[in-house]
UniProtKB/Swiss-Prot annotation:
Homohexamer; trimer of homodimers. A purine D-ribonucleoside binds at residues 5, 180-182, 204-205. It catalyses: a purine D-ribonucleoside + phosphate = a purine nucleobase + alpha-D-ribose 1-phosphate; a purine 2'-deoxy-D-ribonucleoside + phosphate = a purine nucleobase + 2-deoxy-alpha-D-ribose 1-phosphate. This is Purine nucleoside phosphorylase DeoD-type. Belongs to the PNP/UDP phosphorylase family. It comes from Klebsiella pneumoniae (strain 342). The gene is deoD.
Amino acid sequence: MATPHINAEMGDFADVVLMPGDPLRAKHIAETFLEDVREVNNVRGMLGFTGTYKGRKISVMGHGMGIPSCSIYTKELITDFGVKKIIRVGSCGAVREDVKLRDVVIGMGACTDSKVNRLRFKDHDFAAIADFGMVRNAVDAAKALGVDARVGNIFSADLFYTPDPSMFDVMEKYGILGVEMEAAGIYGVAAEFGAKALTICTVSDHIRTHEQTTAAERQTTFNDMIKIALESVLLGDKE
């Protein structure tokens, strides 16, 4: 049954959904990687599609920017449409010297300056982590594709334009691989409603050096990340 934000019916979505922030990127993924594609959502322009990858039913849908937006969509997908696994596929900024442009980062855990998980968890710290099996399958898929993926903690920021750049020093000290804006929220929603989640990012810019990838470079690396996500789904089906 349709929700206020998703005009689909039960069965329209697969049990696994890939979620980029940008709905147009969701459209690109569907058109580039999936077969027998059909649109299943267009409310507020947040496009969603369902198709098949190597015969496996998979959906892809945008989640918007920031934890409030992605939390709405992931919650409704899980509770109203029977989705069991969410894979966020997006970009991140690096803060460490050894993390380079175009690196693929698998977010094993997600720190955050947002309070959303404290609201869920009676004002205590909640360890926002990805599902271990999904992490393992993504690592194995990356190896099979010849991609040297980084695995570790990322940081989900509430503010894109931070007023306190010194926080990047703290992130570097604690080994944060990349900064993005959604993973901690998605992991919290998945935990609350009994689903599984994973975030895979590509490094699109380096916050320290101010290096940025070109549009062509972003697309190539982005495609590597999507292949990892899709192949990891197939590996998960074998478990």
